[in-house]
Amino acid sequence: MKISKRQQDIYEFIKSEVKEKGYPPSVREIGEAVGLASSSTVHGHLARLEGKGLIRRDPTKPRAIEILSLEDEAETPNVVNIPIIGKVTAGMPITAIENIEEYFPLPEYMAAGETNVFMLEIDGESMINAGILDGDKVIVRQQSSAINGEIVVAMTDENEATCKRFYKEANHFRLQPENDALEPIILNNVTILGKVIGLYRDIH
């Protein structure tokens, strides 16, 4: 998660005061600590910290600032905004703006250090035997080739991105679903958009 230097200073000051004194500082004390004379400016920074989930405030109480990650003293993991693709425009780069439906804030470690990644939301149950369920978001590293048996995202003749297991065979390509009730997709040509390297699932 990216925050400004001033917001980081404010966050660290609040955290140290809570740890040392057992209660948070006042807005005036925060301003004095980080060199801000205007209380409204301090309030603005606090609002942004709250919006990023780092603190929680009670507007009815002057000192009610709760640090949300104080329990484990762990740093908030960096977040990267990963494009979620939908319908793919032929001839365009996979992450071209025409293909992107939205951006998803993913903890950086889940991208496995890769920078050229995108996500695809799974629609249907074609990959359930591989543990990929309807509504899951697969994390995909962009690449144009694959080894037999790898799970890839490929482009169909209808310009839809589909997640299947890849096989290159004698005179065709086979995109194999991981669902015994479904038939494979057989193609003379295939455009591989990337290899699946991870999975994100919302637990409701």
From Swiss-Prot:
The active site is at 126 (for autocatalytic cleavage activity), 164 (for autocatalytic cleavage activity). Keywords: Autocatalytic cleavage, DNA damage, DNA repair, DNA replication, DNA-binding, Hydrolase, Repressor, SOS response, Transcription, Transcription regulation. GO terms for biological process: DNA repair; DNA replication; negative regulation of DNA-templated transcription; proteolysis; SOS response. It catalyses: Hydrolysis of Ala-|-Gly bond in repressor LexA. GO terms for molecular function: DNA binding; serine-type endopeptidase activity. InterPro entries: ArsR-like_HTH, LexA, LexA-like, LexA/Signal_pep-like_sf, LexA_DNA-bd_dom, LexA_repressor, Peptidase_S24_LexA, Peptidase_S24_S26A/B/C. Its EC number is 3.4.21.88. Residues 27-47 bind DNA. It comes from the Bacteria. The record marks 90-91 as: Cleavage. Belongs to the peptidase S24 family. Homodimer. Represses a number of genes involved in the response to DNA damage (SOS response), including recA and lexA. In the presence of single-stranded DNA, RecA interacts with LexA causing an autocatalytic cleavage which disrupts the DNA-binding part of LexA, leading to derepression of the SOS regulon and eventually DNA repair. This is LexA repressor. The gene is lexA.
